[in-house]
Amino acid sequence: MNPVGLWILHFDWGPSGNYHWTPLYFNFDGTFAYLAGANEGTWAQVDDMILWRFKRLPESENNTIYSGNAGRNFMSGLMFSFQGEKGSWYAVKKGTKVFSIKEKVKIPYLIDKESKPKLDPIGKKM
């Protein structure tokens, strides 16, 4: 698996089930850029495990970290922010065809009002 390229990151801070998305670009030199802001960081991969860390606070170890499993066109895992927030995420490589089953009946636990994220992908309050 080679993560280099454009990915769409879907993230959810907390167990709300409301995922928000943003583009993320992984460079061949072990860096990445969060396209919705001037944030960047570094990434590393070993076999099917991937880890990336934002460099929001370059002089500090307290930066948001994403870790998870990675396949050719999909990856998912957990994230931890510098403020102590926890969440889950998944990313799909740009250009990947994704199919899903649409439910005919809206199940009560899936009905939820649209909300704006309280935290952005790097864990900063919005």
Show which residues each predicted segment covers.
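A short, structured loop/turn motif at beta-sheet edges
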Residues: 44-48, 69-74
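An anionic, turn-rich surface loop/hairpin at beta-sheet edges
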Residues: 52-70
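Tryptophan-anchored aromatic micro-motifs
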Residues: 1-19, 35-37, 45, 77-79, ...
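A structural detector for short beta-strand units
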Residues: 20-24, 38-41, 62-67, 86-89
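Short beta-strand-to-coil "C-cap" segments at the C-terminal boundary of structured domains/repeats
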Residues: 69-70, 90-100
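N-terminal glycine/threonine-rich, aromatic-flanked beta-hairpin/loop signature
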Residues: 13-51, 57
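Short, well-ordered strand-loop elements centered on a beta-strand within folded domains, enriched
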Residues: 31-36, 51-53, 74-80, 100
